[in-house]
Amino acid sequence: MKKVKVCSPGTSANLGPGYDIFGLALSNPYDIVEVEKTENGITISVEGEKAEEIPTNVDENTAGVVAKKMIEDFKIESGIHIHIIKGIKPGSGLGSSSASCAGIAFALNELFELKLSKLELVKYSSLGEAVAAGAPHADNVAPAIFGGFTLTTSYEPLEVLHIPVDLEVLVALPNIQVSTKTAREILPKEIPIKDMVNNVGKAAGMVYALYNNDLDLFGRYMSKDCVVEPCRANLIDGYTEVKEKVKDMVYGITISGSGPAIITIPKKEHVIDIENIFKEVWNCPVYYTKVGPGCYVEEIE
């Protein structure tokens, strides 16, 4: 095996009250990560969405950081060339950096037959997130590896729970810049007990709803975060207006990750109406897609 081509999905983290815990894999958008054996060293090339803004230096690129660590840990003597085709816009709130991290970990596992578990792949993938977010995070890389719906419940040790789900989602991607750093800095350092109770209760209810295939309950609770979303809503011009306009057309709506992407669980009969509202307010790309699988191999040479 000389080359492997992997599809790595976009993801939506938080989903309302599940801040830094919940994650969802999306069938669209996605990145393609190609890894080819070379004589020595690690080289990186990028094309696609905002490719010119993505560093190709190994120590500054999220995929490069993951690759370097895995090559060191497993004493891989071969060099590699990483080619990333970005289908997920960086800074979108749809796990762009996570797709690169998960895609390279998955690809190296296949190319060099490392036989790592999905949990081990999440652990390596999360190291690359430190480049983008300042610290390792798994709420996006976990669904990118596992697919479906994931809960990252612990980091020491790393624990990820996985629930296969069948959901359709409608995602808007406003052309608004939201810095992940700013979106984290504006969050409160402490919260009242009543807010903690609200979010824990709603998050638990969402898991219950998934097991009972209750879209109404899942979406209603997804929309009821009282800690993070109120702080971030003002970073996305028009969000409060849109949330009010579509409230009867969706089961649930919230900010995807740190934004600016907005994720909804739409009522099928209103999909076109919601799309029109998104385009009227933001004139932006819209994805009508399903919850999808984690990384998978597209091609091997």
UniProtKB/Swiss-Prot annotation:
Its EC number is 2.7.1.39. GO terms for cellular component: cytoplasm. It catalyses: L-homoserine + ATP = O-phospho-L-homoserine + ADP + H(+). It comes from the Archaea. It is found in: Cytoplasm. One of its GO terms (biological process) is threonine biosynthetic process. It holds the Pfam family GHMP_kinases_N. Keywords: Amino-acid biosynthesis, ATP-binding, Cytoplasm, Kinase, Nucleotide-binding, Threonine biosynthesis, Transferase. It is an enzyme of class 2 (transferase). ATP binds at K89, P90, G91, S92, G93, L94, G95, S96, S97, S98, A99. Pathway: Amino-acid biosynthesis; L-threonine biosynthesis; L-threonine from L-aspartate: step 4/5. The keyword Cytoplasm applies. One of its GO terms (molecular function) is homoserine kinase activity. InterPro entries: GHMP_kinase_C_dom (IPR013750), GHMP_kinase_C_sf (IPR036554), GHMP_kinase_N_dom (IPR006204), GHMP_knse_ATP-bd_CS (IPR006203), Homoserine_kinase (IPR000870), Ribosomal_Su5_D2-typ_SF (IPR020568), Ribsml_uS5_D2-typ_fold_subgr (IPR014721). NCBIfam families: PRK01212.1-4, thrB. Belongs to the GHMP kinase family. Homoserine kinase subfamily. Catalyzes the ATP-dependent phosphorylation of L-homoserine to L-homoserine phosphate. This is Homoserine kinase. It comes from Methanococcus maripaludis (strain DSM 14266 / JCM 13030 / NBRC 101832 / S2 / LL).
